[in-house]
Amino acid sequence: MGDVKLVTSTRVSKTSLTLSPSVPAEAPAFTLPPRNIRVQLGATARFEGKVRGYPEPQITWYRNGHPLPEGDHYVVDHSIRGIFSLVIKGVQEGDSGKYTCEAANDGGVRQVTVELTVEGNSLKKYSLPSSAKTPGGRLSVPPVEHRPSIWGESPPKFATKPNRVVVREGQTGRFSCKITGRPQPQVTWTKGDIHLQQNERFNMFEKTGIQYLEIQNVQLADAGIYTCTVVNSAGKASVSAELTVQGPDKTDTHAQPLCMPPKPTTLATKAIENSDFKQATSNGIAKELKSTSTELMVETKDRLSAKKETFYTSREAKDGKQGQNQEANAVPLQESRGTKGPQVLQKTSSTITLQAVKAQPEPKAEPQTTFIRQAEDRKRTVQPLMTTTTQENPSLTGQVSPRSRETENRAGVRKSVKEEKREPLGIPPQFESRPQSLEASEGQEIKFKSKVSGKPKPDVEWFKEGVPIKTGEGIQIYEEDGTHCLWLKKACLGDSGSYSCAAFNPRGQTSTSWLLTVKRPKVEEVAPCFSSVLKGCTVSEGQDFVLQCYVGGVPVPEITWLLNEQPIQYAHSTFEAGVAKLTVQDALPEDDGIYTCLAENNAGRASCSAQVTVKEKKSSKKAEGTQAAKLNKTFAPIFLKGLTDLKVMDGSQVIMTVEVSANPCPEIIWLHNGKEIQETEDFHFEKKGNEYSLYIQEVFPEDTGKYTCEAWNELGETQTQATLTVQEPQDGIQPWFISKPRSVTAAAGQNVLISCAIAGDPFPTVHWFKDGQEITPGTGCEILQNEDIFTLILRNVQSRHAGQYEIQLRNQVGECSCQVSLMLRESSASRAEMLRDGRESASSGERRDGGNYGALTFGRTSGFKKSSSETRAAEEEQEDVRGVLKRRVETREHTEESLRQQEAEQLDFRDILGKKVSTKSFSEEDLKEIPAEQMDFRANLQRQVKPKTLSEEERKVHAPQQVDFRSVLAKKGTPKTPLPEKVPPPKPAVTDFRSVLGAKKKPPAENGSASTPAPNARAGSEAQNATPNSEAPAPKPVVKKEEKNDRKCEHGCAVVDGGIIGKKAENKPAASKPTPPPSKGTAPSFTEKLQDAKVADGEKLVLQCRISSDPPASVSWTLDSKAIKSSKSIVISQEGTLCSLTIEKVMPEDGGEYKCIAENAAGKAECACKVLVEDTSSTKAAKPAEKKTKKPKTTLPPVLSTESSEATVKKKPAPKTPPKAATPPQITQFPEDRKVRAGESVELFAKVVGTAPITCTWMKFRKQIQENEYIKIENAENSSKLTISSTKQEHCGCYTLVVENKLGSRQAQVNLTVVDKPDPPAGTPCASDIRSSSLTLSWYGSSYDGGSAVQSYTVEIWNSVDNKWTDLTTCRSTSFNVQDLQADREYKFRVRAANVYGISEPSQESEVVKVGEKQEEELKEEEAELSDDEGKETEVNYRTVTINTEQKVSDVYNIEERLGSGKFGQVFRLVEKKTGKVWAGKFFKAYSAKEKENIRDEISIMNCLHHPKLVQCVDAFEEKANIVMVLEMVSGGELFERIIDEDFELTERECIKYMRQISEGVEYIHKQGIVHLDLKPENIMCVNKTGTSIKLIDFGLARRLESAGSLKVLFGTPEFVAPEVINYEPIGYETDMWSIGVICYILVSGLSPFMGDNDNETLANVTSATWDFDDEAFDEISDDAKDFISNLLKKDMKSRLNCTQCLQHPWLQKDTKNMEAKKLSKDRMKKYMARRKWQKTGHAVRAIGRLSSMAMISGMSGRKASGSSPTSPINADKVENEDAFLEEVAEEKPHVKPYFTKTILDMEVVEGSAARFDCKIEGYPDPEVMWYKDDQPVKESRHFQIDYDEEGNCSLTISEVCGDDDAKYTCKAVNSLGEATCTAELLVETMGKEGEGEGEGEEDEEEEEE
């Protein structure tokens, strides 16, 4: 027989491993990498981190490549749990630099590099808004060394990993992954050990931050393992994925064999560092044999008669990790290309030795090689290698060509295959009839038949999921009358899947595929029913007692126990074999009361109750009489419930609760690491009775630490402590069960299999436990793995095997477990014994840490034998049941995408949610197994839906209703499932603190967010999953009592007997009684029926009826025969016998026939009513109390009134009266922006309201204002006043008032402008273009315009003859052509600036200049030097453009093809009708006055910019919402696109030419007092495709500096924007110089200095302003070029060169004619352009204030109260939507016509999601609002919902958007003074229409000016 042996080695040792369930080697991974740190000179530096891996990794620290010597200076520590540190004592200057930490073990090596910065005494200020928490945070800013570094290096990581790809031959395969790391990692793709090179078939590229490998026209030979390796200076990472290539009819080559569990294979492995395997390659891949990492050696002992052999390679388990029970499957060589090779280390090569032996060939078959696995009895035969087939299928045959044999020889393979070159005659196989896909029920007999023709007669094989099927138990394959049959005698669920049949003969082969779906038959549901009920009892204090009852139902009911209607905390409960039992040990007086057993399943609920009386011990003399005395007894505090350690994820909410008993009442304080916690917005304290809670709204890593609760009163004090660990999210997915294991009932001597399928990323480790003890494989017990399926096999089971089995899954993200029971049947056992055994194993069904917290809810298990000693042990474990329940928090980290994928895979939600079984018939055996199959769907819900923390108000609304959890799953686009006829009745809603912990706070997205908050999933779905001790407020469970007598249960049945048990007596069962059959009860009937109703549109509708039934009926509602589900607007509830349906705000579509349907096991009843909804448009005005929802008597002008009959007119609701409850602060009065003359005084007065105490703080530029001799602040209870007595220029700026109280904060801003005469023009006037009698004089604008625009400049002249200053001219621009100068005189010039407030002092004097012939000759020489290739630039007559409103653009120009598009609109080619000249037309859509004003400003700015290097505007037109700018045509394309052209040679000389021109153009812009603010590669255009002339375009973001005062902006392209913009600091001309520096850096190197993986990272890089020339790209670049860039990329804007200095810089002064022209590589530039092209799609210019990492700078301008808090501006949107309390101050409000402070924005949404337009309207009287869709009024409905609140926020929400909603939407606000409108477009992306985005023409912008 043949042996398979896989041999590998490492540098360290050679080993032979048996790949069994022993612990696998795991490469090291830094779970907490050390961070960069800064320390003071002489201080101690400490690098800390944590590493994991197996075996325990060894840590070594290196500096400059050398290991650090340990001693007094360097102290290295490494603990057993992976925590390590490096301490450097007494840090000196020489210690600064980079340190490398290396973690190594047998699994691999991982490195991370960190930097130590040693600072002198002047510590630099750490000011990084992108990385810091929100300003004014609740805790002090952590020390620098503990902050995550944003400028340091970080090792590469895979944010997403490539998945396995399955493609058909000839198709395109694509792997993708997302990587992070700094510096940007280098990416390489390999197949085996061969590096892939780019060619026409293999394309490696990066797109929007995602790395792709694309393989065109995939061949069978391309199959195999592909590895992506990423490397940077901080480390290295790699990940592999498999490409599987299918033949034409193949579906999957890696599926599981039918009903055949795999067995472990012993493999010996040898890992080597580098493969010596070499082959002739093309494209870096071996030409024929593609599995390059595997060498094959065949030792043939007995050759087969045909001298043919098949080569096999091993296939590893799904997760690709060594040692996880790998299995070597026999796969033909050709197929091995599509399978994973074993990955021992990152680089491995494997050797497989195969020894072929003689095998008995089957009749009518070719000779075969049999692959024997060690330790396996059954043999699997594999089809031999076919050498002469005409058509091949990779799963059946691998054709070996002479070329491949040549390759094999080179690879060292000994060959024993003789090729037979004969051409057989005959006919290839053909299917005459094929099997068809079918659906079958479980247990059904299935036959697939196929008829095949061919000559010679074809052989036929059957496959399931690509794996050959063999005859075995329950499977038969045979041929009958020429028809081939596959017979499955009894179908089971596991038989579902894809089947195929293949026929082959020497002439060829063919195959056909089909699907089999096996479904479980439905089982009839039966509501719970008590056959024997609870019986009351009386016990003495300290005794044990047991309550029990018998209950039946299908599916098996959930049992919940209540004491006095409250969930029981400490008792022990079981439910087995229909017996529900509650055991209370050591009864206490508080255990006295009414006990209720509540049984619930999908069909209904039932309950029964009994009274238990606990007699107190007579230890006190007169218990009753001394009760008052007891109350007065004083004692020191004691903790009844203390703190327990918690582990939570970053961003979770945490609640810590203690229970304290003390008299007198104790004082409580909370401490964090010994420091008292103050109550703030983030930390809340709460007291409920004896319970005290600390709420942390959102935890951060710095919240980790020891928390202490101290309680004291005058008699003493006590404390309790616990540790909170905040974990940062791990990449990946928590383990979960694809298919859970089932409980098994077996007879002694049988073999038992317990199987499950699992998933998780990284793939989880699996541990099996029996009764808490880990199982180790041994005699009679095996643990197998086949990919993701794990199986426990128990052979010849005996009574000792019975028990509780647990499967635990773990990975770095989390863990998951599942319990099943194994029970043995004993035929002699009586029913009574079975029940007794069940009671003895009371603890088996409980799993406290598995996810059931709170009201004790237990799984169901049938009874099994257990020895009395085991029983006692179990009881002893349960002894301390009153102790604190341990809390365990498990969170799952998911990307939205992975959640969607996971949900999409869950085709039948019932398989996941509770294994709800719906079958028609069931065998008795099947019914026994059902209880164990009930899964806890709540765990799955928790995984899928992020629970929402409910307000008290919402709890009241939602608590009694049953939420259909299927609607939750359907939310994200899974197929909607029709509502079943039976809706489960309500369940008690008990809040679960875990859902609070798991709730991530997400501010609601505005204006088009498709994310709808998850409905109240907990109210129904998680009701049983909650704890009475939960740290969230828990409303009482709704349990309706209707008993009239304590001794009767809810249904009037007799009460069961309970037992009194001696203190330590053994639990003895009550006398067993035969269980009577469950009674059917009475059918439902309506005691009160529904009444017809007539209701006005917008009013509230309540329908009610009463139902009588026994058992209680399940109730459902329909409208016009369509099922109704509870939703935000429709509330369905059931309280006892009363059922109601409530619609808060009725819409016209709510009219129709409503039916209430009640159903139980005994029957069904229904009643109906009609509801008529009246349209109120024709009725009288609404009542004042309902202003918000009804149309009031309108004050609209006649135009709007006529429209209002078809449209919804919304009136602003009246401000609310002050609520009695506490309210957050509000700013009710605030000053407008102010402008004052210098020296005048100014008062800023604000009124505030809210719950006292309120603190008012005035801030300027994020710093608190301190009082001084000029500034005074007066704060009163409800007002605040800031007074500046004598204003100066430095008092200009934005003043922010922040008001705060315990409930929140508000802020508002006002801009103060101090006006004066301008400053003198900056710098020195400059003379240029000096001729014989003329020159051009130019100058800079004023550095400060005095708060009013500079209107003109006065030029003064001095000459050497007159020797005095005289006025020469007055002009508006910053240049003037001076004429009529005389050659014999010297001249000087100076300039003054004038605004409305006066004329400035004169500027500096110019240099002395003379005019004459010499200068003119030099000018001619310079002109002659212009290079020929530039040619003459197109002459454009400079024009001052005024917008033409009389004509259309088409009257003057012919509009031709479109040249591009962007957010502004589109660009078309225009031809002037008169002259035939070609121009570019930029067509804008401008709906609002603001948009039109912006475009007019752009035209106005371009009128000032007449320069050869700037594109010119020659005409402009305006017609309604369209504005057209006619621009000079620049046809050469973008500069960077020109550079990467094949015919363009890039040298440093070209770079100098381009940078000169850019500097000249920008210099002129600056001289006009203008900043461009959007300099980037896309805005630098080539004049033509041959020369090197360029022009700057796009002045849409340009601003006048001289008229803006201290100008701040919040827009720009992150990659090119300057730090001062991000920090929201005043900008200047230097802001453009930074952008020029970035462009120059990219131009010379092809690398971007600041680009990160996303905008936030890019902005963080810019803010830190750290960059370097370390890359090899700069090796060829001159020092002058580097110096030029260095002088531009300076964080301090004052230190940057200006344009004039740039032009005088040595680099730009170089002689480009004679300088050496060294060719620069364009590869990096090509990559940069490819990445940029993807990145800029749709968002080239971003409003930086909207980026979350820039949250600190948002809300810094704008007048009104923004609703954002200074500590958390990111929540502004959320706070703004709160119902705010505003005091009405009518007498102070002037009448104002409506205007929008926030307009609606264009948006794009996917079909089926929701869209929302938001705006904010101001005006007085309060405006009324109407919405229009394409100029048609919108009527409010379920589809269109309009909200308008008292703050003026108005929104239009469109639910379930469809293609028809793609339109232009307008919001119109009207009052008696006038109207205002704003318009936006909704673009609906229908599915399957991706990739339609056009290129962005010249501009793509989004501007936010506040």
Swiss-Prot record:
Active-site residues, Swiss-Prot/TrEMBL: 1574
Principal location class: cytoplasm
Post-translational modification (record): The C-terminus is deglutamylated, leading to the formation of Myosin light chain kinase, smooth muscle, deglutamylated form. The C-terminus is variable, with one to five C-terminal glutamyl residues being removed producing five forms differring in their number of C-terminal glutamyl residues.
Taxonomic lineage of the native organism: Eukaryota, Metazoa, Chordata, Craniata, Vertebrata
InterPro entries: FN3_dom, FN3_sf, Ig-like_dom, Ig-like_dom_sf, Ig-like_fold, Ig_I-set, Ig_sub, Ig_sub2
Protein function: Phosphorylates a specific serine in the N-terminus of a myosin light chain, which leads to the formation of calmodulin/MLCK signal transduction complexes which allow selective transduction of calcium signals.
Region (Calmodulin-binding) residue spans: 1700-1763
Extent of the IIA- repeats: 660-676, 758-774, 1107-1123, 1817-1833
Region spans: 4 X repeats, motif III: 970-1226
Compositional bias segments (type: Basic and acidic residues): 309-321, 403-424, 833-850, 867-881, 1039-1051
Stretch list, region 5 X repeats, motif IIB: 693-1866
Alphabetized GO MF terms: ATP binding; calmodulin binding; metal ion binding; myosin light chain kinase activity
Family the UniProt entry places it in: Belongs to the protein kinase superfamily. CAMK Ser/Thr protein kinase family.
Region of interest: Calmodulin recognition (RS20) region: 1730-1749
Compartments in which it is found: Cytoplasm, Cytosol; Membrane
Protein name (record): Myosin light chain kinase, smooth muscle
III--type repeats, residues: 970-987, 999-1016, 1061-1078, 1209-1226
Region span, Disordered: 127-157, 309-453, 831-881, 947-1086, 1180-1227, 1414-1433, 1885-1906
Residue span(s) of domain Fibronectin type-III: 1321-1414
Catalytic activity: L-seryl-[myosin light chain] + ATP = O-phospho-L-seryl-[myosin light chain] + ADP + H(+); L-threonyl-[myosin light chain] + ATP = O-phospho-L-threonyl-[myosin light chain] + ADP + H(+)
Subunit composition and interactions: All isoforms including Telokin bind calmodulin.
Ig-like C2-type domain mapped to chain residues: 28-117, 156-244, 429-517, 521-613, 637-725, 735-830, 1084-1172, 1225-1313, 1794-1885
Location of the region described as Motif IA in the Swiss-Prot/TrEMBL record: 1317-1364
